[in-house]
């Protein structure tokens, strides 16, 4: 009797269907990660062409290491909000999804911006953890200043992007990434960094542009409400 009720329960989902749902979200997300890694490989390749001593690519490495503290905040909020978003979508509580995602983005942007501004202001001292070279310190400090804008876009991108994936709208972030990671990040690194001669500063302008453009796209997609019709659970 119990087994029959469990089998006929509308809440019971076949393993094959669950696997299909996992692939529906997981495969596009994997593609986005692969596209990002390829894009960053091209960025590093261009930065290696900026000088023979590797000053610019090393400066980016230092700046990235410092900025990762800001990134951790955004990533944590994005993951936490994604879990809550999944719950609310399952309960058809779309207004709660919207409010929660908006709050997570606001808190993330404020926290990441405060950290980024602090790192930029104290960059002259923080970079000395890695090196005492004056030229390197000055360059990394400039990159940390640009990183304020980059983190603003990246946190927004993370929160709204993860929320879209959780809702089942996993293809849109991949399309945005495929277009703008290569146009803005890779193309910007080449144009601003090599063509205009801004070197690592130019590369960071391209990277910041990529994050901010994709962030705007994620927010607009979320506000369009199209994700409400892409839920994995009926």
Predicted segments with their positions:
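Short runs within selected transmembrane alpha-helices of multi-pass transporters and secretion channels
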Residues: 74-78, 147-166, 172-184, 188, ...
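Hydrophobic faces of transmembrane alpha-helices in multi-pass small-molecule transporters and flippases
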Residues: 11-42, 65, 69, 73, ...
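Transmembrane alpha-helix boundary and packing residues in multipass membrane permease domains
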Residues: 29, 33, 41, 45, ...
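Short alpha-helical transmembrane segments in multi-pass integral membrane proteins
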Residues: 3-27, 85-150, 192-234
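Juxtamembrane/interfacial segments around transmembrane helices
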Residues: 7-10, 32-35, 39-40, 74-81, ...
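Helix-terminus/linker motif at the lipid-water interface of multi-pass membrane proteins
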Residues: 34-65, 69, 87, 125-134, ...
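Small-residue-rich hydrophobic transmembrane alpha-helices
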Residues: 44, 57-123, 154-177
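Alpha-helical membrane-inserting segments
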Residues: 35, 39, 43, 47, ...
């Amino acid at each position: 009797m119990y087994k029959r009720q469990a089998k006929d329960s509308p809440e019971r989902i076949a393993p094959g269907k669950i696997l299909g749902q996992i692939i529906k979200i997981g495969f596009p997300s994997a593609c986005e990660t692969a596209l990002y890694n390829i894009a960053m490989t091209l960025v590093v390749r261009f930065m290696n062409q900026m000088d023979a001593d590797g000053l610019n690519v090393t400066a980016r490495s230092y700046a990235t290491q410092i900025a990762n503290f800001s990134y951790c905040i955004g990533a944590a909020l994005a993951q936490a909000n994604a879990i809550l978003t999944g719950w609310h979508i399952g309960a058809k509580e779309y207004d709660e999804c919207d409010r929660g995602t908006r709050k997570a983005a606001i808190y993330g942007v404020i926290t990441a911006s405060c950290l980024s501004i602090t790192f930029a202001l104290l960059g002259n001292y923080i970079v000395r953890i890695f090196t005492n070279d004056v030229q390197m310190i000055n360059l990394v400090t400039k990159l940390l200043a640009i990183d304020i804008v980059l983190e603003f876009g990246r946190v927004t991108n993370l929160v709204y992007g993860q929320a879209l994936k959780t809702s089942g709208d996993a293809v849109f972030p991949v399309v945005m990434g495929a277009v703008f990671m290569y146009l803005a990040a890779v193309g910007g690194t080449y144009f601003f960094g090599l063509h205009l001669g801004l070197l690592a500063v130019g590369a960071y302008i391209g990277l910041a542009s990529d994050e901010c453009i994709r962030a705007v796209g994620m927010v607009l997609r979320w506000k369009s409400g199209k994700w409400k019709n892409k839920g994995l659970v009926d």
